[in-house]
Amino acid sequence: MSNNTTIPSKTATDICLTDRQMSLSVSSTEGVLIGTIIPILVLFGISGNILNLTVLLAPNLRTRSNQLLACLAVADIVSLVVILPHSMAHYETFETALWFRKFYGKYKFQIIAMTNWSIATATWLVFVICLERLIIIKYPLSVRKQAKFFTPRNVVTIIVVTTFILTSYNHVSHACAEKLFCNGTQYHVACLGIDSERWFRNEPNPNSEFMKSVVRVAPQVNAIFVVLIPVVLVIIFNVMLILTLRQRTKLFEPSKTIRGDSQFTQLQSKTEHKVTITVTAIVTCFTITQSPSAFVTFLSSYVHRDWVTLSAICTILVVLGKALNFVLFCLSSASFRQRLLMQTKQGILRKSTRTVSMVTSSTVVVDSLPESRKKSRVAMEMIERRTSASSCLVGGNRADRTHRANSSQSMIGERMPLKEFRRGTSFV
């Protein structure tokens, strides 16, 4: 729901705004950083996370950790998609386009709310993934007790609903007034905070005191529970995870005396160890790229100053962290690389077999046309032969009857002399 209101005016539509007034960038530095670097990282991050999903959602790899990592990939994809309109606003092609200015002007704060929601979801998912790995490594027996309730579905649902509630204030935090200038060729939007003392046309603020207080308090609550607390917890648990990995590395030295169940147990522990290494790499990258943005967001809620350039740099770091997940999977997991190569080869083989089958089916259809014509000709010749043969049979039956009658008479006439001959020449 957009909070846009139209300011009626009689003469303002004839006034044309300058390029600076029509610019959607706060500064030229922000335009260069957000408009140039972000699109490349967004495209790379979306394609990389899609490849991550193809491997993590394979039927034989749907473990608890992989399901949580797949949910993290989905949250990162959503974040990258909703960040893209902010980057497009810094291009002159979209900045001067009437349709884009209307869309971006009406739904800018809804896009910001979606961005904050998806980033908050990804932040808490990283915390849950790190905590889950730490519990599996340090307390493997307690996982079965907690597996019934703390399933990936329940955990992700709780995170998504909670972060939506904490970031939903962005949908109602501002009210915007839209107007067409320069005889309807320029679209401009001006926005004010709900808690602003000055309103449009210097009128009194029509919003209630409850809404004003909610909009004032909500950013601070969001900064604490969505930004500061999860990032600090991720840093603490990531350090604990790294220390635990260093302690357990000595346990996986090659041994020749391992047999039976102990060998299977060590093999399973090695697998968990490799998964933990991948998770540690992802969480460490998240900590490095997300922490500056978290602290800048937290400080901007209390210290009012110009954070434009620093916020743009932090945004690039956040997008870079989401784009590097695919690289981290490939570098830290040999099984991920093997699965990805195998699925790529299978996809290429499927496409090649489909094209070959389509080509062969088309050639069979083309080759079958003259064969069908030949078969029809042969069938016509067979029918003609059968009709001629049937006519010959009808005429032949009559001739056979007359021939049999004549032959029977001739045989009777011939037998009589034979009998007489036999009687006359008998030796009795």
From Swiss-Prot:
Its main location: membrane. Keywords: Cell membrane, G-protein coupled receptor, Glycoprotein, Membrane, Receptor, Transducer, Transmembrane, Transmembrane helix. It is found in: Cell membrane. GO terms for cellular component: plasma membrane. The chain crosses the membrane at residues 31-51, 68-88, 111-131, 155-175, 223-243, 279-299, 310-330. InterPro entries: 7TM_GPCR_serpentine_rcpt_Srw, GPCR_Rhodpsn, GPCR_Rhodpsn_7TM. Residues 1-30, 89-110, 176-222, 300-309 are extracellular. Glycans are attached at residues 3-4, 183. Residues 52-67, 132-154, 244-278, 331-428 are cytoplasmic. CDD domains: 7tmA_FMRFamide_R-like. Gene3D superfamilies: Rhodopsin 7-helix transmembrane proteins. Pfam families: 7TM_GPCR_Srw. It is a multi-pass membrane protein. GO terms for molecular function: G protein-coupled peptide receptor activity. Belongs to the G-protein coupled receptor 1 family. This is Putative G-protein coupled receptor F59B2.13. It comes from Caenorhabditis elegans.
